[in-house]
């Protein structure tokens, strides 16, 4: 028994801010699954931060019903995916659950770096790709030029491209008809053993983990006992259903369906994205292909500004972890900042989102240390190991070498800004591997560069030197040898562990000078001299001095012997020496924030 041909599963993929969520809004309005009174823009972006930033952080699934012009009724399951490179694994899982993809392209901007990346991802999964030219209502929209890009850059048939304005609802009917016509129906049989792909999950305070899944073969119903094939854990299905903005309960789901199940799972880390679901009494012989553990690539420690709020921060981290399986954390402590957590993130945007959610949703002020990547240490004796923080790096031990992760950076830029972009990449230790002129006005650059070099201001810099026209995407490569050192910051000879950084040796001096200058501006003057130093091991490479507040001890001397004044000044000097020996310099929180949040460093 094969599946009804009236089911269609597709995802919406695009570069950042090309209109995915707005198009999803139009589909929802067209299907009338929510009243006009309850409708709001960015309907699927449930988090406040998503709405404010205009970005999608978590993939969202919706099932709608559409009656086509040929009179047939179609069940359309679509996934609105994130556009940022940090969440590309989430996009790949969404793509794995579909047969078709709508590739959105901004009519005013044309094909961008993430457009190309998502296209290849969909192409590798053998999806039917429908190019969609969005924002045709803009005064600078150039539909003919974008169609040429679709043909020349992507090798797609530009004649099937649908021109729409998701904002104004223009062309939505034509697009829905194209989906019904071109997206293949799901393949598979409900008689085969159950095989379903988990592509997302979220946590419900009352019912536990709600698992989002797509059934490829077989069927599932309430009361079935299931096994997750990679974790080998077994669970009893309490509820199944589909997504219609809210969860809509069903008695049974079968091959081709996209829906959810609830099985009393209390910890979201027990559910692995990409895992295969099967039945215990009639298991599948092999899992679906493509499963891999999602691993953090950026690391930073988070501390509460108020040390008394540590327990509150622990509760906040636990709550965030329930809805974000990709977030990792463990307890950490610093002599300067107190107790906190060492966290792993998918990228810088992921880090910013978590920080903002802690501050907004839990009303906590936090400090994050400088982001770092995972380095591989090759000792002269023993096995290699990984480190994520400066405290784990001991430069004096017998080390054969240090390796750092590299990326393949894909940059698309107008030809007039080519020189500017190449200069930025050179400063970031980039090695050019490819330069392709896409047409007379645009060029595609491929660079191999260290992941650590794009953590701070790389994206901002390429946007700045190209007046906002450059687009950037990257994928992780392997580890390569590097010349790494630990840069320590000392205040009056005491190391401030929270300000230590792992840096490339050639850029250590520049970074040290910048940090010392910033600390000099932020630390209040004392009655004794304060030395701020940047050091690699015992070698000081930068120094700033905060001069002491000086009392005029000779004010009471009116004329007379000069030796009297000298005695008073010598006495003051001796007193300041004693103060320096016993005096602790208090570094204000704003000084840490100034250094840690500064893109210049």
Swiss-Prot record:
It is found in: Cell inner membrane. The keyword Zinc does not apply. Residues 5-187 form the tr-type G domain. Keywords: Cell inner membrane, Cell membrane, GTP-binding, Hydrolase, Membrane, Nucleotide-binding, Protein biosynthesis. Its EC number is 3.6.5.n1. It is a peripheral membrane protein. The keyword 4Fe-4S does not apply. GO terms for biological process: positive regulation of translation. Gene3D superfamilies: 3.30.70.240, Elongation factor 4, C-terminal domain, Elongation Factor G (Translational Gtpase), domain 3, P-loop containing nucleotide triphosphate hydrolases, Translation factors. GO terms for molecular function: GTP binding; GTPase activity; ribosome binding; translation elongation factor activity. GTP binds at residues 17-22, 134-137. It catalyses: GTP + H2O = GDP + phosphate + H(+). PROSITE patterns: G_TR_1, G_TR_2. Required for accurate and efficient protein synthesis under certain stress conditions. May act as a fidelity factor of the translation reaction, by catalyzing a one-codon backward translocation of tRNAs on improperly translocated ribosomes. Back-translocation proceeds from a post-translocation (POST) complex to a pre-translocation (PRE) complex, thus giving elongation factor G a second chance to translocate the tRNAs correctly. Binds to ribosomes in a GTP-dependent manner. Belongs to the TRAFAC class translation factor GTPase superfamily. Classic translation factor GTPase family. LepA subfamily. This is Elongation factor 4. The gene is lepA.
